[in-house]
Swiss-Prot record:
Its main location: cytoplasm. InterPro entries: Mur-like_cat_sf, Mur_ligase_C, Mur_ligase_C_dom_sf, Mur_ligase_cen, Mur_ligase_N, MurCDEF_pg_biosynth, UDP-N-AcMur_Ala_ligase_MurC. SUPFAM superfamilies: MurCD N-terminal domain, MurD-like peptide ligases, catalytic domain, MurD-like peptide ligases, peptide-binding domain. It comes from Thermotoga neapolitana (strain ATCC 49049 / DSM 4359 / NBRC 107923 / NS-E). One of its GO terms (molecular function) is UDP-N-acetylmuramate-L-alanine ligase activity. This is UDP-N-acetylmuramate--L-alanine ligase.
Amino acid sequence: MKIHFVGIGGIGMSALALHEFFSGNEVYGSNIEETERTTYLKKLKIPVFIPHSEENWFDPDVLVKTPAVHEDNPEIIRARKENVPVENRLSYFKVILKRENREEFAVTGTDGKTTTTAMIAHVLKELNRSPTAFLGGIMDSLEHGNYESGKGPVVYELDESEETFSEFSPNYLIITNARGDHLENYANSISRYRAAFERISRNSDLVITFAEDELTSHLGNVTFGVRKGMYTLEMRSASRSGQRAIIEKNRKRYAELKLRIPGFHNILNALAVTALFDSLGYDLEEVLKALERFPGVRRRFSISYHDPENNIYVVDDYAHTPEEIKNLLQTAKEVFENEKVVVIFQPHRYSRLEREDGNFARALQLADEVIVTEVYDAFEEKRPNVSGKIIWDSLMNLGKEAKFVDDLSRLNSVIVPRDNTVFLFVGAGDIIHYSKKFVETLQSSTNSPSRVSGSKR
């Protein structure tokens, strides 16, 4: 079969393309711009065309499109004209899962999907279960970063931004939380949003939920939480080299959980995974050993640069909701106790910024300094009076030192390199490109007297 992927450079779409390619199908696709994934696909000899054009056409049997691609896309128009079936990403993914007909592990929810899914895939690999994994991020221990083909269970994350996620039927499901992100895709109805989680829960044999989540805690056969739930945490300690916590099961001391990666939110992600595998009867000791070796996911508190002489760090993180940003900054303050934390934040989607109102500023005020850029639109139409400046205004009202940069080409001239400082580049858009440019600046001026000397807090 010949499959045309429109938006093939996205992290989710590229995983589907890789699966179909390694399943023996003829695969090609297009993207609006080059990405790390388009470069990788080309190395595998998968044809990728930049940008979209009606000439990117080789008589496919089906066209698969990302939700970011609209009906006015020239390739969609041509497919309609030539009566080629057009499938959305999730609807086509259901076709794949039906064809594979295997045991399924899935993760959905607002925060922590990618890391939790990666943990499940990692544990199954370590336990020689040979999973096929579809990941919404890059984990270096997966053969293709966001995808690996195996003969065992299928592991995937389900993006709740599309209401059709509720039509899936995984055997085992973790719902990390549900905070109403993407509510605009549910006609701004919280009851409709809640109903989608209820539907997918009914479709699953085992559901693990966060006991402290208002919308979904009641849906779980098994629950986890800080103080509430079947699986809880008794105490936790953390350092730069990792963290550990005592797990209680039904209020009794049960096991010790160790992780290399930082962040209390990651202990909760790992607790959910532990609850899942323990409930399924896996060897708990082997599961915990595997989690201790979990390498993490790129752009999840990824240190991309460290100058030990001047004590400067650059950290990249995909956080793009207020809760994720709060978790990120709490982690940064825990890991970097003596350094100043400067956040460079790129808001993602006008709809999210408008809906969350002052929540971003309240999360960002945990930083010592904040630089806010203009919104990364993610193919949304610009909305009147919705701008990154909203966050800057709120931060200033909170008395937080902040700057607003409306032109990203000026960003690196605004960031002042200084000693004893952690620079956090945060967002789900293209902020990573500017992080790389900043690292290049630091590397070229390591011994420059222009660097500002900052005192440790």
